[in-house]
């Protein structure tokens, strides 16, 4: 979903990062080596199955689990994380979340935190910067503005209204000024 969304926005230059814990700094992370190994390997496996090129960065994981970050480099700054998917084996247990499996046994789920567009503010700032404010028409809140040149002409105003109705029938967001 992240990459199809990027395609919709024309984002082609990005870098995938597998953010891992630092095993030498265990105080910074949830203390469960088995969980960490399982989660990190699961993300590696998914990335490899998808054929994604990625780098691994030690010490960049969240305290509760590893994550896949998708980073971009804006025109005027350093690389930023736009999207993220985070595996969380820790918090479901802390919140005592359970589900019943097919055998009727209670199990603790794994939570996937994901932000397809990341912080909306950051995403919009990136898109505005990259497009220099020339957003794609499909993204504009008002796609067409109809402005009759003679506002005191009833026939012209009726025609302008007709144009607006035709456009709205085609799911075009239109405004009559």
What does each model-found stretch correspond to?
Residues 1-177:
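NTP/phosphate- and nucleic-acid-binding module
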